Design a protein with these regions (language model features):
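Intrinsically disordered, low-complexity Pro/Gly-rich regions
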Residues: 1-44
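Core segments of small alpha/beta cavity-forming domains
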Residues: 69-115, 260-301
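Short solvent-exposed beta->alpha transition segments
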Residues: 92-151, 287-315
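Structured interaction patches on ligand/partner-binding surfaces of diverse proteins
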Residues: 226-261
């Protein structure tokens, strides 16, 4: 028999060595142990989550508390007190910005810091109390205050405004604490309060003068003297929620500025009187219609002044009228009168004149204009 040759059928196949059963089971156990969570790691994760939740809760509670604390100072009465604090401090500009006075700009002349700085007394706050309608969007707040020791109350209307960031309360005071003061004048064209001035309306026979607005306080109204013949006589009033004045005339203004005339006017009256007396004591000056009738004659042959007034006395009923005693010595022919020389006693009266605005009328030389007459 021939020898058979065995030819290879293909590439040899590699065979992994067999793993013992004990080793295989051990590897499986290690893999399972690695993939399973350990008790310590899970506990740490739970603690971290708990801490985060706790912090968030603390922040939420703190935020709620902070909002409540903030809103506790954003109440209707707090808003009113803030407004009154500005007035008490004389901060008129900030008070006006906070609560609109509700008047035209040309009526706000005296609602300024400078005017309030001039006040002898300003607002003192005693108490501020809101009503109990806590859920209402419109609240009533009553403030008790003083000016110069005089107590008064004022009720404010406060309305709820749009909240800030949706959570912080806002309130708006609707009515400003301003008071109307009526002013009239006789003999003055202007007056000042503090560093502000205004035209002084002429005093009327009846009714009140022009109206101006003021914040509470004690103010001095100082008239501006139009000439050297007029003194400036100030008037001081207490402005609360109404004006506390000394006059009781219901038709009178709160402030009446009445001109007072000084010695310069008396001197001017004497000077003017002396000139007219000298004129009447001359011929033909004696025939001037203002001269005493007894010396207005062409039968007068001589005239002189026997007694010249040295002082012109103001009339009690009219401080702008003056009088003085004059004696002329006149000599007559027998044309109309009994011939001879005799004294003519008379009273010189000078009335100062006023223009249409009630101001002292002056001539082109700046001297007072007088109407001259003789009583007899």
């Amino acid at each position: 028999m021939g020898t058979e040759k065995n030819e290879p059928m293909g590439a040899p196949i590699a065979v992994s060595p067999a793993i013992p059963a004990e080793c295989d089971q051990s590897m499986r156990n290690e893999t399972a142990a690695a993939s399973a969570p350990t008790p310590g790691r899970g506990k740490k994760r739970a603690m971290a989550i708990g801490i985060v939740i706790g912090v968030l809760l603390v922040l939420v509670v703190a935020g709620v508390v902070a909002i409540k604390v903030a809103n506790s100072s954003r109440t209707p009465e707090a808003q009113v007190r803030q407004y009154l604090d500005l007035l008490a401090a004389g901060n008129a500009s900030a008070a006006t910005a906070m609560v609109d006075p509700g008047v035209a700009n040309d009526q706000r002349t005296f609602l300024t810091d400078g005017v309030m700085a001039s006040a002898q007394s300003r607002l003192v706050i005693e108490d501020v109390v809101a009503d109990r309608n806590d859920e209402s969007s419109t609240r009533s707040v009553t403030a008790t205050m003083q000016v110069n020791g005089e107590r008064f109350t004022h009720q404010f209307t406060v309305t709820k405004a749009k909240p800030t960031m949706g959570v912080l309360d806002n309130w708006q005071v609707k009515d400003a604490l301003v008071t109307q003061v009526s002013v009239d004048a006789q003999g003055y064209a202007q007056f000042t309060v503090g560093d502000e001035s205004a035209d002084a309306p002429k005093k009327q026979v009846t009714g009140e003068g022009a109206t101006f607005f003021f914040y509470p306080g004690v103010y001095t109204f100082t008239p501006v003297a139009p000439s050297e013949y007029v003194d400036s006589t100030p008037v001081t009033v207490a402005v609360l929620d109404v004006v506390h004045r000394t006059n009781t005339d219901g038709d009178a203004s709160d402030v009446s500025l009445l001109a007072t005339y000084n010695n310069n006017l008396k001197d001017a009256a004497l000077e003017a009187g002396t000139k007219i007396v000298d004129s009447c004591a001359s011929i033909p000056g004696n025939q001037n219609s203002v001269c005493p009738f007894a010396i207005q004659s062409d039968a007068l042959t001589a005239i002189s002044v026997k007694t010249m007034p040295t002082y012109m006395e103001p009339l009690k009923t009219d401080p702008g009228a003056f009088q003085g005693h004059v004696t002329f010595t006149a000599t007559y022919s027998n044309k109309y009168y009994m011939e001879g020389t005799r004294d003519v006693d008379t009273v010189l009266i000078l009335d100062v004149q006023f223009d249409s605005d009630g101001l002292l009328k002056l001539d082109q030389d700046g001297k007072p204009d007088f109407r001259v007459s003789f009583a007899r």
